[in-house]
Every structure is written in structure tokens, then in C-alpha cells.
Amino acid sequence: MRGEGIRARKALGQNFLVDRHVLARIADIVDMRPDDRILEVGPGKGALTEMLAHRCARLVAVELDTRLVPVLRQAFRDNPRVEIVHGDILEIDLRDLLAYEGGERWKVAANLPYNISTPVLFAFLDNRDLFSRLVLMLQKEVGDRLAASPGTKDYGILSVFFQLHFDVTREMIVRPGSFHPVPKVDSAVLSFVPLEKPRVAVGDEQYFRRLVKGAFSMRRKTLWNCLKNAGLGLSGEQLSEALAVCGIEPGRRGETLSLDEFAALSRAMMALGGK
């Protein structure tokens, strides 16, 4: 077995996916074509890499664990389509890593460690123009938040930000027994297809993000109270006016607002001088 004797490191959030049926299903969800370019994050011992490598034109796998890099390079030494990159995905410039491939968009396959999933998600979000499809395995709780609808307990910042720019699909649940060592929680595989343009116009996206973060900053508080203290450049009176223009009751909670309502509110607040 490849990498036999190398134990998962808790500090790296490692849980190696060992279920061949789940691995095959993930490879199918990636939906590869012979000319596709694949970025794999966290290949581990290379089980998924092996299934992907013979179905695409090129595969770049980024692995942080210094013990696994030589194992992976040895395993794929005879496959010129595979490149193993030693590094931290959070510190690598994705544009530098992938841009030399002639501008073609990449597909992503990743089993994200639970402890870094959110910052990696935002790295993908902010570089979304590089990708045509992402297939990510995440802690189920994070997956639920990404795909949540307004008014549900899981709906929040991740839901709004990602649904603005991606079609997000829950693909499958992966039980703990599919991993070694066995984690304490379920995982979920989700696919993300970047939209050609945002689902709705938000005006200045940085302002929109600050607004959304403010709206979810105190879930027990009303929307008006959350936004009043969010540093968005409006007085309480102006905030009330913006909410009225959008037909949004100031006593609502942030988690009840749809993406369209957040976008309309962002535009209205900026029109009144929000900054």
C-alpha cells in the first residue's frame, strides 16, 4: 500500500479517504474530459490522484506534508501529466501556479482539512475566474452552510457569498468509516460551478461583503441593530431609509434576507453615501 506506515497528523487535520467506492464517485463528479486540467489539493497518499491522473491532460497536486511528497513523486514518476507541488495552498499564488497553462480554466478536486476549509474556500472564491468546476469534500456542517437557504439555521455568510458567484450542489454525504483515521463527524461532497457573472448586481462587492458580515455579526439582534454598528458609513436615520426603500423591515434578522434582498440593500445603502 502506498505510504504504508505514514500516520495521519492531527495538526494537519489529516483524515485519509480510503473507501474506493467514494473515491470513484468523487472522480465521476469532477466530470473530467481528456483535455481537462485538474488542481488537486491535499492528495494525501494519492488514492484520488490515481483515479484522476489517467483521465485528464494535466494534474497538479499540492501537498503540504513533507513525508508524503516523495511518496507521491515516486508513485507518479512515470506519468508526465502529473506534477506534485510541495506547499501550503493558503500561501501559494494560484494565479502563478496555474496561469502558465495558456489561460485554460481548471477543475478542482480537494479533500479539505476541516481546520483550514474556510480560508481555502475564500481563496477559491476570490480566484473563481481560474476554474470551471470545483468538487470539494468538507465537513458536513460547512457543506450545509454553503448550500443553505434563507431562514434556515445554517444560512449565513458562506451561503450568501458563494451562492452569489456559484451554482452550489450537494452531491453526497460521506460517513466517517470511509476515512482513516475515522473522524467524529460526517463529511459532504459539494460541486461548485462558477457563474459567468454574479447572480445579482451588488454594486461594490467589498462593501456588499462588509454589509453581509455585519448582518450576521449578532444573530440574536435585529438587522437594524447589527448594521448600525457595522461601520458602513450611514447614520441610523439613513440606514432606516435604505431599509424602507428596499421594503425590508428593520426588525428582521439577517438570516431571513435573501441574496436579492442583500444585494438591493447594498445598492441602496451605497446610494445614500455608504462607504
Swiss-Prot record:
Q: Which UniProt keywords apply?
A: Cytoplasm, Methyltransferase, RNA-binding, rRNA processing, S-adenosyl-L-methionine, Transferase
Q: Which GO terms describe its molecular function?
A: 16S rRNA (adenine(1518)-N(6)/adenine(1519)-N(6))-dimethyltransferase activity; RNA binding
Q: Which PROSITE patterns match?
A: RRNA_A_DIMETH, SAM_RNA_A_N6_MT
Q: Which reaction does it catalyse?
A: adenosine(1518)/adenosine(1519) in 16S rRNA + 4 S-adenosyl-L-methionine = N(6)-dimethyladenosine(1518)/N(6)-dimethyladenosine(1519) in 16S rRNA + 4 S-adenosyl-L-homocysteine + 4 H(+)
> What InterPro entries does this protein's entry cite?
KsgA/Erm, rRNA_Ade_diMease-like_C, rRNA_Ade_Mease_Trfase_CS, rRNA_Ade_methylase_Trfase_N, rRNA_adenine_dimethylase, SAM-dependent_MTases_sf
- Give compartment(s): Cytoplasm
Main subcellular location of this protein, as a coarse class: cytoplasm
Classify the source by domain of life: Bacteria
Of the GO CC terms on this record, one is: cytosol
Residues bound to S-adenosyl-L-methionine are: 15, 17, 42, 63, 88, 111
Report the Pfam families cross-referenced here.
RrnaAD
**EC code:** 2.1.1.182
Its biological purpose is as follows: Specifically dimethylates two adjacent adenosines (A1518 and A1519) in the loop of a conserved hairpin near the 3'-end of 16S rRNA in the 30S particle. May play a critical role in biogenesis of 30S subunits.
The record's similarity note reads: Belongs to the class I-like SAM-binding methyltransferase superfamily. rRNA adenine N(6)-methyltransferase family. RsmA subfamily.
UniProt cross-references to PANTHER family, sorted A to Z: DIMETHYLADENOSINE TRANSFERASE, DIMETHYLADENOSINE TRANSFERASE-RELATED
Q: What is this protein called?
A: Ribosomal RNA small subunit methyltransferase A
> Which species does this protein come from?
Geobacter metallireducens (strain ATCC 53774 / DSM 7210 / GS-15)
